[in-house]
Design a protein with these regions (language model features):
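All-alpha RGS (Regulator of G-protein Signaling) helical domain and cognate RGS-like helical scaffolds
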Residues: 1-171
Length: 171
């Protein structure tokens, strides 16, 4: 269905942005716990991107590159670019890329929570679309994305709370 295609295509770009964010953890001096989380996100989402790209290829459908791209929407016959749910703006991405140490940890967790909530919205949109999400592979992928994101949001909220309650390091 169109809903399945939109989900698979959109989630490739969505996951690609999360991977870009996660790859900054080590060079930007993230804490060990944030680095571990970032590595987990990268591994899981790279595998899911490959699965989604193969699903589209198998159906001879256009396969988007695995890079963060805005979604094109037609409104009133005019193309509009907009970010998919939870996607970070260019300004947010620049802010995260420039952050270091504890500031990076705080921004990474805050923005990745926003990003993951957007993925949940995309799953809800898929399952709310007539006839979409019925195929076994798509149902399982979307269900896995939902479960993983809910679990990771809870983990990141705990990590953010711990970061906020910990005393900043002495200068």
């Amino acid at each position: 269905t169109d809903g399945d295609i939109d989900f698979m295509s959109g989630m490739i770009s969505h996951h690609a942005q999360a991977i870009v964010m996660a790859r900054w953890a080590e060079p930007n001096g993230a804490s060990p716990s944030v680095r571990t989380l970032a590595a987990r996100i990268t591994n899981a989402q790279q595998d899911e991107i490959a699965l989604m790209q193969n699903w589209l290829k198998d159906r001879a459908l256009p396969v988007p590159e695995a890079k963060p791209m805005p979604m094109k929407m037609k409104m009133d016959g005019v193309d509009h670019e907009m970010l998919m749910p939870g996607m970070l703006s260019d300004a947010q991405m620049q802010e995260l890329e420039a952050a270091r140490g504890r500031d990076f940890d705080r921004l990474f967790l805050t923005y990745m929570i926003q990003h993951h909530r957007g993925a949940l919205t995309m799953v809800e949109t898929l399952f709310g679309s007539q006839g979409a999400g019925q195929e076994d592979l798509i149902f399982k992928l979307a269900s896995d994305v939902h479960t993983d994101q809910v679990t990771e949001i809870a983990r990141m909220e705990r990590m953010l709370a711990e970061l906020a309650s910990a005393a900043p390091p002495a200068p």
